[in-house]
Amino acid sequence: MPKCDICGKGSIRGFQYSHSNRRTIRRWKPNIRKVRAIVDGTHVTLNVCAKCLKAGKVQRAL
């Protein structure tokens, strides 16, 4: 699974409980986007989560 290149956020695992309290393992995935960004004056493709995009931690390349 991809991780955010800015904050390092990745998927986490936990249990999904049914009505009878049976447990099955499930996974929560972050909202990861591939973004062309400017890093040190060059265009680079990064995996960035939506929270970092909204916060403006990445300068997007147009």
Swiss-Prot record:
GO MF, any single term: structural constituent of ribosome
Domain of life: Bacteria
Keywords assigned: Ribonucleoprotein, Ribosomal protein
Coiled coil: none
GO biological process terms, semicolon-separated: translation
One Gene Ontology CC term in the entry: ribosome
Cystine crosslinks: none
Pfam families: Ribosomal_L28
InterPro entries: Bacterial_rp_bL28, Ribosomal_bL28, Ribosomal_bL28/bL31-like_sf, Ribosomal_bL28_bact-type, Ribosomal_bL28_sf
Recorded family membership: Belongs to the bacterial ribosomal protein bL28 family.
NCBIfam families to which the protein is assigned, alphabetical: L28
UniProt-recorded name of the protein: Large ribosomal subunit protein bL28
Organism: Caldanaerobacter subterraneus subsp. tengcongensis (strain DSM 15242 / JCM 11007 / NBRC 100824 / MB4) (Thermoanaerobacter tengcongensis)
Gene expressing this chain: rpmB
